[in-house]
Amino acid sequence: MASGKFITFEGIDGAGKTTHLAWFCERLQGRLAAAGRQVVVTREPGGTQLGEKLREILLNQPMDLETEALLMFAARREHLALVIEPALARGDWVVSDRFTDATFAYQGGGRGLPRDKLETLERWVQGGFQPDLTVLFDVAPQVASERRGAARMPDKFESESDAFFSRTRAEYLRRAEEAPHRFAIVDATRSIPEIRQQLERVLAAL
């Protein structure tokens, strides 16, 4: 653990990733404390003052598909410049609730934006930068829908159909298949204790 690492949590809405993020980060911080390193917890869209303003717009206002993707990457560039890159340079670890895989899954898989357009934006905004580890919480859209139904007032993405989330999930799994060295897939249909057992194995491998 000599240098900072970047970890992302991904999954469709209702997969339960946010439920486990604080627990995971607390466990990770316990391992890093002896080395004097911190865990920076953040999210996308968001993580910066500008990013949080864009988050409010992106999650609640209808807009053109390409506009949506551009705003996602604009928020990401600010996030990288102000939060992620400085933290990693300090040797800290960063754990983000979503990153670029979400854009490929939601705007690409879910909304149907051509992959080559997203790849162009990814190269421009990130260069070759990718997470060291992506923890993908995988769950069937029907299960996720039942979980979301008991939640607060849904945003525009949470209100999407099971068909939308089927496409989103398929894109997540495709990306995981293309980069198995980067992804750890968690069976998010399991109980909370069982999911945390899976996450313990992820932590042990870091």
UniProtKB/Swiss-Prot annotation:
Q: Which GO terms describe its biological process?
A: dTDP biosynthetic process; dTTP biosynthetic process; dUDP biosynthetic process
| Catalysed reactions, semicolon-separated | dTMP + ATP = dTDP + ADP
Q: Which Pfam families match?
A: Thymidylate_kin
Cellular component, GO annotation: cytosol
Q: What class of enzyme is it?
A: transferase
Q: Any idea of its EC number?
A: 2.7.4.9
Give a yes or no for keyword Cell cycle in this entry: no
Q: Which domain of life is it from?
A: Bacteria
Question: Record's InterPro entries?
Answer: P-loop_NTPase, Thymidylate_kin-like_dom, Thymidylate_kinase
User: Could you say which residues form the signal peptide?
Assistant: none
**Which molecular function term from Gene Ontology is one that the record holds?**
dTMP kinase activity
Q: Does the keyword Lyase apply?
A: no
Q: Kindly list the cysteine pairs connected by disulfide bridges.
A: none
Q: Which UniProt keywords apply?
A: ATP-binding, Kinase, Nucleotide biosynthesis, Nucleotide-binding, Transferase
Name the positions where ATP binds: G11, I12, D13, G14, A15, G16, K17, T18
NCBIfam families from the UniProt entry: DTMP_kinase
Stated family: Belongs to the thymidylate kinase family.
Function text:
Phosphorylation of dTMP to form dTDP in both de novo and salvage pathways of dTTP synthesis.
The name of this protein is Thymidylate kinase
